[in-house]
Amino acid sequence: MAARINTSLHNALSFLKPFNTPLNTKPFSFRRNSFRFSKKLPYYSQFSSGKRALYCTSSSQESTVDEGETFVLTTPLYYVNAPPHMGSAYTTIAADSIARFQRLLGKKVIFITGTDEHGEKIATSAAANGRNPPEHCDLISQSYRTLWKDLDIAYDKFIRTTDPKHEAIVKEFYARVFANGDIYRADYEGLYCVNCEEYKDEKELLENNCCPVHQMPCVARKEDNYFFALSKYQKPLEDILAQNPRFVQPSYRLNEVQSWIKSGLRDFSISRALVDWGIPVPDDDKQTIYVWFDALLGYISALTEDNKQQNLETAVSFGWPASLHLIGKDILRFHAVYWPAMLMSAGLELPKMVFGHGFLTKDGMKMGKSLGNTLEPFELVQKFGPDAVRYFFLREVEFGNDGDYSEDRFIKIVNAHLANTIGNLLNRTLGLLKKNCESTLVVDSTVAAEGVPLKDTVEKLVEKARTNYENLSLSSACEAVLEIGNAGNTYMDQRAPWFLFKQGGVSAEEAAKDLVIILEVMRVIAVALSPVAPCLSLRIYSQLGYTEDQFNSITWSDTKWGGLKGGQVMEQASPVFARIELNPEKEEDEKKPKVGKKTGKAKVKVVEQTPTVAEA
């Protein structure tokens, strides 16, 4: 994959390191699962009312999380049959914002992502591109790392299922499940979807035995395979979901999972006799382990350290169980049904939550190369920069639901919110401060805001943003931060400090305080928006006179009013977000995209947002 694509100078900065400064504040209340599955007891008997439930809550009551508890967050391990697409980028952007928020709360975060590199589809894709499987996996896996860097994804662990340490964990896990009597050998005949790498029930297929996910006909196969006794875990899984309804989120995804289980669980094949590219089944090198039985264990193998012993006991000691599996809804069954049953069989704790988000469409249509309407993440971030891409998808898509992208909507949103509401407010205020106060704050922001209702408004909106971040309501969190910006703009317009400065005397003194208040609003915005748009937040912080090291040490407590101090010198005003402008001669085409045809292109242009005539 080519080297990292250069992004807009104003919308992209160097890759931000995660910040890990402790914070004395209420931690995110993902409650620790207090039970461990033992092979000595019936599985369904281990859920007593005396045990704490495995679920997430965002109530204001004291959390049951132990001090210093690790927050482990995972994306799926992405399949390397093809380069990353926008759906994968969306999942990872969301995960990164959650991880950054948890770090702001002072949590030790382990953010895991990686690539799933075994299976028939990988071998086929490699051959089609004239490569052997290892070469193909190296190339595509690196493309994911490159995209994550471009999007300012601050992951902690990147696991590849071709890593030797992963294979060691998979084989030990397989041996545990086998020893528990949950693996047996049998012949299987059925309809197989190569793209899903899964046998399908006829009742779930479309006309002509087409897979409902890939719209391609399934093929008839007969194999001698090893099977996992999933049916044995129907009652335990029903009990888990009944006692811990927040185990699967959003709630309508829980309903889907309960429906699958209620319809009856069937044992599933966990090996392939016709696939060479995979981890060999222990004691039977003629078969390889099914890609999903393999890949799910990447969430555990990622926890191991290269210089430590590679076994399950060591791996789980570094942070298992996961606090949150963040996935697309298309792989919900694997994570909410197969994976918990596998963990129970191996005597390991379950993850605390599985969150299945929706799909993305473009201009209201499903994306596809045949339609000529694919959305390429590399091109998008090259064109608009990471802040715009991150903000749009987290702000515009209600997390959990399906969402739609259109370039026209994208440009309108990021220009209105980031360039105008946030960027222009900062630019105007710093301009007035330079002209009238030599870029120096006259008093502490706490003193300036005495008796000013705006301070209370901002504090309420900060709490609203925090609650929404905790609830994984990322769109609502963005909206709360934007409301802070709107409140700051309203205050600026109502107070009209440019007019007060012209009055002189006490009026000018009040105007100088007004500028301190507005800049404190901007400082709070920079902290509260940093999980979503870290580079933009850094640029705001820098113009307020802070260093990058100071920004990297912020915590959520820095959203508390009172950070700016009298005598603090601000930097020269310059646009913190490049306004996106349509190419004028192509504007009409841009507003009316035609499927399968290239339309006019938008461009990023820095627009100096000068003060109004009255302000000047």
From Swiss-Prot:
Enzyme class: ligase
Disrupted gene: phenotype observed: Lethal. In heterozygous plants, aborted ovules.
Cellular compartments annotated: Plastid, Chloroplast; Mitochondrion
Keyword Protein biosynthesis among UniProt keywords: yes
Reactions it catalyzes: tRNA(Met) + L-methionine + ATP = L-methionyl-tRNA(Met) + AMP + diphosphate
One GO molecular-function entry: methionine-tRNA ligase activity
GO cellular component: chloroplast; chloroplast stroma; mitochondrion
Protein's recorded name: Methionine--tRNA ligase, chloroplastic/mitochondrial
Organism: Arabidopsis thaliana
Gene name per UniProt: OVA1
